[in-house]
Design a protein with these regions (language model features):
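Compositionally biased, intrinsically disordered low-complexity segments enriched
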Residues: 5-8, 246, 504
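Substrate-binding and catalytic surfaces of secreted/luminal carbohydrate-active proteins
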Residues: 21-91, 196-198, 227-234, 239-244, ...
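Short linear sequence signals and composition-biased patches located at protein termini or domain-edge surfaces
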Residues: 3, 182-183, 501-505
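Cleavable N-terminal signal peptides of Sec/SRP-targeted secreted and luminal proteins
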Residues: 2-21
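Active-site loop signature of alpha/beta-hydrolase-fold enzymes
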Residues: 149, 251, 359
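Short, conserved phosphate-binding/catalytic loop or strand-edge motifs used
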Residues: 249-255
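N-terminal catalytic cores of secreted or lumenal carbohydrate-active enzymes
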Residues: 65-244, 248, 263-270, 274, ...
Length: 510
């Protein structure tokens, strides 16, 4: 039977300076844990210690299936006497790769709907858990849908008046003011370094063909739709949110396969390239938003690099596009080598992972949340490691928060989320997925550069050097037993670590 441990003594004890606020566990059984947060308490990292340890030491943060959550200790370099070795990994920070831009999640309508059901104090705790650079995950990215997504209670765009080619009736929705803008601005209060990017699920219905339920933008509305997106940038700026980047639209392949005419829109690779070259690109370039980046594609990687080749081989389109946005769905069926191929073919273009979530059981099963699932947290951290090691500049989760059914969703496509909201008790639950992203986002600052580290089938790894010349190493032990790991830094020395079973580990040293 589910029960919550909320001992007040824990709350008092762990507010001591320099000691992390420990997880108050919500348990189903002994090895399945989420962490409970409410208006007065939420686990977080300590705020009374130096950012990096003294020379010769490393901070070591551990989250594991047994219940540790970001548990911090110090380990000394070159203290390996009589240490048994299972795995040796070598770091070389002279071998550098891509620069990291950040990590984040999406301010969907559903996220806002769920946050709004909490008390004001608990709302701030939730936003702090993600965006506070001191105690939270230090997220620096936020994705904002342009109009409705499936994670809205209704299907809408900003101009549903047929044939309004001058966009006279363009207007933001109540959902923008009540949910998206409101909480995006609150996040900015915690961290002014947040950059927001946006994608539309669809153009207004009257701009599209809808033959047999499959939906594409009509060519006569190519410029009107570019103007529509420009108006969105205007309205959000007028309401305090600058948009750093937009994509060419959410999941154009999905709209070419599934009949969801009201909340999807397909593109063919060649027509997308032409629209960028002749409409979207010039429209943004001649506007006050000429520094707003454009990312093409925004879909699953199984058709890369083929889908973006027409865009990047069309010089009139290529000059406007910063890179390729990609989602994680179907990754198990498509090796990450396609990201390397895309990078190798177009090395001057960025790769950016913009959506991940755990969908769970089939679509007709409405119960998609598996509270406290370690396996789902494992999927997250392995995905982040993989994308970092294959040229992505960031990794962005989908909904920041959902309810205990994984909704609301207007097509019954409920899913899981790193934070689950319980308005009845004015609480939210931080799942293992939350800590998986935090093991990266809290330590890998914007401007960090990925560096070389050897890999292993059991111990998955990624390594970075930050703009402050700190080294950050993330390790995941996939084994169900401890592993003794020797971490050799060519410049710094050797760390000897006993990694607990199924554990997430972040090391930080100067």
């Amino acid at each position: 039977m589910r029960h919550v441990w909320k001992t007040l003594l824990l709350v008092t004890f762990f507010f001591n300076k320099g000691i992390a606020n420990d997880c108050v566990p919500y348990r189903i059984d002994d090895d399945v844990i989420a962490c409970v947060c409410n208006a007065t308490y939420c686990d977080g990292l300590p705020d009374g210690r130096p950012e990096v340890p003294e020379e010769g030491n490393s901070y070591w943060y551990v989250t594991n299936k047994q219940g540790l959550r970001m548990k911090m200790s110090e380990v000394k370099f070159d203290s390996c006497e009589n240490f048994p070795v299972d795995v040796t990994l070598t770091i070389d920070n002279t071998k550098k790769y891509q620069t990291i831009f950040g990590f984040g999640g999406a301010f969907t309508d559903s996220t806002g709907i769920n946050i709004a059901k909490l008390s004001p104090a608990t709302q701030l705790q939730l936003i702090r858990a993600y965006y506070d650079p001191k105690e939270g995950s230090r997220y620096t990215l936020g994705r904002i849908p342009i109009g409705a997504s499936d994670f809205s209670e209704r299907q809408y765009t900003y101009d549903d008046t047929p044939n309004d080619t001058t966009l006279k009736h363009f207007i933001l929705a109540n959902e923008d003011f009540d949910y998206k803008l409101l909480y995006a601005r609150k996040a900015l209060e915690f961290n002014s370094e947040i950059r927001f990017f946006s994608a539309a699920w669809t153009a207004p219905l009257w701009m599209k063909s809808n033959d047999n339920g499959l939906t594409f933008l009509k060519e006569e509305y190519y410029q009107v739709y570019a103007d529509y997106l420009l108006k969105f940038l205007d309205e959000y700026k007028n309401n305090g949110i600058d948009i750093w980047a937009i994509t060419t639209g959410n999941e154009p392949l999905t709209a070419s396969i599934f009949k969801l005419p009201n909340i999807s829109m397909g593109w063919e690779p060649e027509t997308m390239a032409n629209w960028i070259a002749n409409n979207l690109g010039p429209t943004l370039a001649s506007s006050p938003y000429n520094e707003t980046l454009i990312f093409a594609f925004d879909d699953n990687r199984q058709v890369l690099p083929r889908f973006v080749e027409p865009t990047f081989r069309n010089q009139d389109a290529k000059k406007y596009v910063a890179g390729t946005a990609v989602h994680w769905y179907q990754d198990s069926k498509t090796p990450a080598d396609v990201l390397d191929q895309t990078h190798d073919e177009f090395p001057d273009k960025l790769i950016f992972m913009t959506e991940a979530s755990v969908i769970g059981p089939p679509i007709w099963n409405t119960s998609k949340v598996k509270l406290e699932s370690w396996h789902r947290g494992e999927r997250y951290i392995l995905s982040i490691i993989e994308y970092m090691n294959h040229w992505s500049i960031g990794w962005v989760d989908w909904n920041l928060a959902l309810d205990e059914t994984g909704g609301p969703n207007n097509i019954n496509n409920n899913i899981d989320a790193p934070i689950i909201v319980n308005p009845k008790t004015d609480e939210f639950y931080k799942q293992p997925m939350y800590y998986a992203t935090k093991h990266f986002s809290r330590f890998v600052d914007r401007g960090s550069v990925r560096i070389s580290i050897t890999d292993n089938d059991t111990i998955k790894s990624a390594a970075f050097v930050t703009p402050s010349a700190e080294n950050v190493v993330v390790l995941y032990n996939r084994a169900t037993s401890p592993r003794h790991v020797v971490l050799k830094d060519v410049q710094k020395g050797t760390l000897c670590l006993e990694l607990s079973p199924q554990s997430m580990n972040t090391l930080k040293y100067k």
